[in-house]
C-alpha cells in the first residue's frame, strides 16, 4: 500500500512539474511578444522591408530583405559584384549563389526548405508558435537567458535564448545543410530598436556564424513596415 501511495505521489509530482514547465515556457513566450510591442501590433505587421550592410570574410556589401508575412521572404546580398539570393515562399524556395557554383536560380533542397520556413514570420518561431505546429520546451537558464527548444512541424529543432531582463531573443542555434554537410548555425541579435509608426521592435545588429568556419555580420540601416511589396518578386525566375 505504501508503494502504491508513493508511486501516486511521484506521478502527481511529475504531472505538476510538467505543467509548471509548460506554463513557464508560455510565460516567457508571452513576455517576448510583449517586449516586441504586443500581440495586436505584431499581428498588424503584414510586410517588412530592410536595407542592410553585411560583412563577410573581409568583404562588405549591401543587402535587402523583402518579407510578406506567411507568403514570402527574399534576401539579396551583393559581394564583389556578385549577388547571392535566397527566396522562400509558403510553397517552395529557390536560391542563387555564384560562390558555390550556382549562378542560375536553382530550387531549394527539401531539407533546407524545411529549415527556412520560419523566415516567413518576421518575429520568428515563437510568434504564434502553436498555430504553426511548433512545440516549445523550457530547458532551463544559461546565465541570464532562458533556453527554449523549439521543434517545428517538420521535426526541425532550434534552440532559442531569451534575455531574462529584456525578454528579447539574443541567440538562435540551429543546423543547416551547406556544401554537402550539416553544420551548426548560431545567430546572435542585439541593438533592438522601435520601428514607428508600427510601434514594434526589431534587432538592428546580428551575426550569423556557420560552424565556426566563417561568419556574416549585418547592420540594419533601414526598416519599413507595411510597405507595399509585389509578391511576384518571390517567384523563381524561369531559365
Question: Model-predicted segments: where are they?
Answer:
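Bacterial Sec-dependent N-terminal signal peptides
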Residues: 1-25
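Residues that line or immediately flank small-molecule/substrate-binding pockets and catalytic motifs
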Residues: 8, 52, 176
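Flexible, processing/modification-adjacent segments and terminal tails
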Residues: 21-34, 95-156, 164, 176-183, ...
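N-terminal mature ectodomain segment of secretory-pathway/periplasmic proteins
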Residues: 27-101
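Extracytoplasmic
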Residues: 45-47, 70, 131-133, 143-145, ...
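Short, surface-exposed charged micro-motifs
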Residues: 64-65, 83-85, 137, 157-161, ...
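A short, sequence-level motif marking secondary-structure junctions
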Residues: 65-72, 89-92, 110-112, 163-166, ...
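Gly/Pro-enriched, hydrophobic low-complexity segments
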Residues: 144-236
